[in-house]
From Swiss-Prot:
PANTHER family: CYSTEINE--TRNA LIGASE, CYTOPLASMIC, CYSTEINYL-TRNA SYNTHETASE
UniProt keyword annotations, A-Z: Aminoacyl-tRNA synthetase, ATP-binding, Cytoplasm, Ligase, Metal-binding, Nucleotide-binding, Protein biosynthesis, Zinc
Keyword Transit peptide (UniProt): no
Domain of life: Bacteria
GO terms assigned for molecular function: ATP binding; cysteine-tRNA ligase activity; zinc ion binding
Cofactor annotation comment: Binds 1 zinc ion per subunit.
Xref: InterPro entries: Cys-tRNA-ligase (IPR015803), Cys-tRNA-synt_Ia_DALR (IPR015273), Cys-tRNA/MSH_ligase (IPR024909), CysS_C (IPR056411), Rossmann-like_a/b/a_fold (IPR014729), tRNA-synt_1_cat_dom (IPR032678), tRNAsynth_Ia_anticodon-bd (IPR009080)
Disulphide bonds in the chain: none
Name assigned to this protein: Cysteine--tRNA ligase
Localization per Swiss-Prot or TrEMBL: Cytoplasm
Sequence motif: 'KMSKS' region, positions: 265-269
Cofactor: Zn(2+)
Length: 485
């Protein structure tokens, strides 16, 4: 498997340090608000990474933290009358609810900052003792950026260039404008902990250094997060951890691209964000997950409702094919006629191409394309009156089910019972278009009675009324079925 390593700026073969095992640390949310689509994208991207590593046979330990003390949490507490702890608990629970709905596996370990204050203080003390950090008269602790010779290696920034634009805010006691806070002295009304430098709380960057080292051996195999974390957060993590331990912090640095709206990054600060819950009022969670996987995880993805509709259409087609396959396999009589050799070889080639796409830096966009190739092939078999009767066709359909189950387990897709999922999607699309499903069912019953009575004029009139509502009717041996046109 090849992974793009932000540190080396190239794809590299992924070789875990401990045979048969892999460690993955991903920076989690700051728990002060509901998650937006940027959070969904990061969670889905790293969920697929972890699933794929496990698919290859590795024993993966996945750690993702929660930042549960931060300026934003303190501010939200002041706005709502809740304590900082209550704010963090509320939004950590909301995160789990949202990601559970999106089918993201929970991390094996979910450390919280407030549960690791001792480790953070110890790391600060270690850095001070090594001359890499210093405390101030007011009780703040800062990291000496220039004491770490390779500062900037992840982001590709030059220290002297950064220095020219750096400023010291009033009241700060930095030796150098580039230095960043490891420990912040307590302000009135804020949560605090006792420390050798007085009451205070940790800075953001020290948190992940302390928690990752606590729960995983160094160097980490993979450290991940959104592209916005490359600088300063991940750059500062490297400086702290490597200055303190003398060890490499992580071998592979993996970063997902932004979700964009009108070519701008989606973020709370820009005010152009939609929460996951906003989107899931109109679409099924699996549709959103599918949409997020239609682009390579490192590329930006433009969020549009047209894009969501396209994802929904494609996901529906895949499930319709899975439903067809399920029904076709109910047959008990099959002929001895062979399938054309090119059909069997096309299935082999599709499986090879899917594996190749995923091995190439988790190219889910290409992998979904190969799944569509399989869907087209299977529909060709089912629609051909000769091929569909073949016992080899049965074997091909069973193989398709097996392939889709394996691939779906990696992508977190296609795991639902097809007929049930299609009904759910139909009702979701109906709700989005304000179609009264109870009225539809009533009209279908009336149409059924009209057909029994051979009142075809009335039956056709009802079909036309349903069509005006945006509903199409399919008459099947099992009775009338309906869907949104």
């Amino acid at each position: 498997m090849q992974l793009y390593n932000t540190l080396t700026r190239k794809k590299e073969k992924f070789i875990p340090q401990r045979e048969g095992k892999a460690s993955v640390y991903v920076c989690g949310i700051t728990a002060y608000d509901l998650c937006h689509l940027g959070h969904a994208r990061s969670s889905v991207a790293f969920d697929v990474l972890v699933r794929y590593l496990r698919h290859t046979g590795l024993d993966v330990t996945f750690v993702r933290n929660f930042t549960d003390v931060d300026d934003k949490i303190i501010k939200r507490a002041g706005e709502t009358g809740l304590t900082s702890t209550e704010v963090a608990e509320k939004y950590m629970a909301a995160f789990h609810e949202d990601m559970d709905r999106l089918g993201c596996l929970r991390a094996d370990i979910e450390p919280r900052c407030t549960q690791h204050i001792g480790e953070m203080i110890a790391l600060c003390e270690d850095l001070i003792s090594k001359g890499k950090a210093y405390s101030t008269a007011s009780g703040d602790v800062y990291f000496r950026v220039r004491s770490f010779a390779s500062y900037g290696k992840l982001s590709g920034r030059d220290v002297d260039d950064m220095r020219s634009g750096a400023r010291v805010a009033p009241g700060e006691e930095k030796e150098d404008p580039l230095d960043f806070a490891l420990w912040k002295s307590a302000k009135p009304g804020e949560p605090y902990w006792e420390s050798p430098w007085g009451n205070g709380r940790p800075g953001w960057h020290i948190e992940c250094s302390a928690m990752s080292e606590k729960h995983l051996p160094l160097p980490l195999d993979i450290h991940g997060g959104g592209q916005d974390l490359v600088f300063p957060h991940h750059e500062n993590e490297i400086a702290q951890t490597e200055a303190a331990t003398g060890k490499e912090f992580a071998r592979y640095w993996v970063h997902n691209g932004f979700v964009q709206v009108n070519a701008e990054k989606m973020s709370k600060s820009l005010g152009n964000f939609s929460t996951i819950r906003d989107i899931l009022q109109g679409y099924l969670p699996e549709t959103l997950r599918y949409f997020l996987l239609t682009k390579h995880y490192r590329s930006p993805i433009d969020f549009t409702f047209d894009g969501m509709d396209e994802a929904e259409k494609n996901l529906r087609r895949i499930y319709q094919t899975l439903n067809l396959v399920e029904n076709e396999l109910q047959k008990t009589k099959w002929s001895a006629a062979p399938l054309p050799e090119e059909v069997l070889s096309e299935m082999d080639e599709t499986e090879r191409a899917w594996n190749e796409a995923m091995e190439d830096d988790l190219n889910t966009a290409a992998a979904l394309g190969h799944i569509f190739g399989l869907v087209r092939l299977v529909n060709r078999i089912i629609e051909d009156k000769t091929m569909r009767k073949s016992a080899q066709a049965r074997d091909a359909l069973l193989r398709m089910q097996s392939m889709m189950a394996r691939w779906g387990a990696v992508l977190g897709l296609f795991t639902r019972q097809p007929a049930e999922f299609l009904r759910e999607m139909r009702d979701c699309r109906a709700a989005r278009r304000d179609v009264d499903t109870a009225r539809v069912e009533t009209l279908l019953l009336e149409r059924q009675e009209a057909r029994k009575a051979k009142d075809f004029e009335r039956s056709d009139a009802i079909r036309e009324e349903l069509a005006r509502m945006g509903v199409e009717v399919q008459d099947t041996p099992a009775g009338a079925a309906w869907d949104i046109a």
